[in-house]
Each structure stands twice: as C-alpha cells, then as structure tokens.
Amino acid sequence: ITKNAETTIYTYTIENVSGNPKESFSPGPSFLYPHLLFVAKSFSVKTEKKPLFSSPADLYKWYKSLVDSMKDDKTVFAAKVKELTANAKNDEEKIKNIYYWVQDNIRYIAFEDGIAGFKPDDSQNVFQKKYGDCKGMANLTKQMLKEAGFDARLCWIGTNHIAYDYSTPSLSVDNHMICALFKNGKKYFLDGTEKYNSFGEYAQRIQGKEVLIEDGDKFILDKIPVQNATTNTEKSNISYIIDNETLKGKVKIEFLGESRASFLYSY
C-alpha cells in the first residue's frame, strides 16, 4: 500500500501460478479459483463524493440511463408484428409467433466494444440487419411484443458461469440480457439467443439465477424458475429381433428440453 496527498494505491502481486485447467461441464472460474473482485462504490473529487455502484439501485440506475438514451422506432417493424399476429387464435399464439420469429430470423453475434458491451442496440437496427447480440435481441423482442400490446420488459441476468448475484453491486454480476413478459399475473422469460427453446422453457444456464427486471424508475429482483429434470430427458425405445442370424430392429429416440436443443444445435 502506497499513499500520497491525493491517492492510495493498493498493489497485488501473484507469482509462479499454474494455468487454470479447463474441464467440460465445470462451473465458471469465479466458482472455482481464488480471485479479486473490485467493487467501485464511489469516488471523491476534492470534497464532493460521487456514488458509483454501492447498491443494486445504483447499478439499475446506470443501466436505465443507457436504455433511456436509446431511440427505438417501432414503426419500422409494425407491419411485421401485424403480419405475425393477424391470424393468431389467442394472445399466447401471438406471443409465440413473435418470439419464434426472433429466434428463427435474428442471428446472434456478440458485441462487446466499449459501451456497446452494455447498451442494447436500437430495435429497428436489429430488425433491419437481422443480427444482434443478447441485448439487441432482447430489446427487439420487447419492442415487438409492446407493439402487439403486451407488457414486455428488459432483464439483466448472470448465467451460471458467474458466481455472483445482485447482492454484489458490480458490472461483473451479469453477462446476459433477456426479455420478461408480464401476462395475467405471471412472468415469462424470453431468450431470443436460445434458438430451440420453446415458450415457457428456460435454458439450464439461467435456471435459478437472479434476474433484474426493469420497472420504470424502480426495478424488480426475481429468479428464473428451475425446471424439473424430467423436462430435459432423452428417451430411447429400442426393439431387436434376430432374423436368419441378422440382427434387425427399430429405434425411437425422444429428446426433451435441453437434450432436444443440444441435438438440434448439433445437426
């Protein structure tokens, strides 16, 4: 620790440390390895103290400032929303048509350059380019649902790669954005980056994780539902016969949930 008239400098040194091994299906490094996490709560300019991230409210306030600076133009995709919902039998079908259209037609490409790593792209840009990152895809899903008359909101969430929750007010807490839909007293979470997740299904990487939901000047903290293991099963039904010393048979394999998504991504 070194000090001068204006600053205090903390220097951490680590030497002769082996590289961290990578193992399939292991938790993220923040679960496994000793590390330092710097939480910038405030700073002072002369006698004035300026807050940064001392609470989840501070974190949300900054995220909201980014969202408020966006210039969404729903007129660009209003006709597409009308087309997707015109022949729907009910509200659930309208929601599914919009959600699945985003999954099928918007290609996921990550953007992490400067403020673009935190600020969603305007929805009309994602719609016209037909690609975006999780933030842009979440925003397009939200705006298309709003155009259709639904209460849809942006969400910030950390995947199961990250050990922290929002009790730690830091930009290190989350690495993903999704969309929340409020309908008949229930919340549904829509992740356009999960190409093969059906409406009401949640990827294993976000199940049980704390989620920060926009709510005007306030925010809502909730958790993504954890689904029963049986929703992700792979079932095999195999019958064999021996016909003149030749083995013959029929195989039926049924994939559900995450196993279905993995199969579809592979083939």
Located regions from the model:
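Solvent-exposed beta-strand/loop surfaces of large extracellular or lumenal domains
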Residues: 1-6, 158-163, 224-226, 266-267
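Conserved catalytic alpha/beta cores of large enzymes that bind or transform nucleotide phosphates
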Residues: 12, 211-240
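Flexible loop/turn segments at secondary-structure boundaries
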Residues: 20-21, 105-109, 119-120, 159-165, ...
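Short, conserved helix/loop micro-motifs enriched in His/Cys and acidic residues
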Residues: 74-79, 107-130, 160, 171
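Active-site-proximal cofactor/substrate-binding loop regions of enzyme domains
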Residues: 92-108, 121-132, 136-151
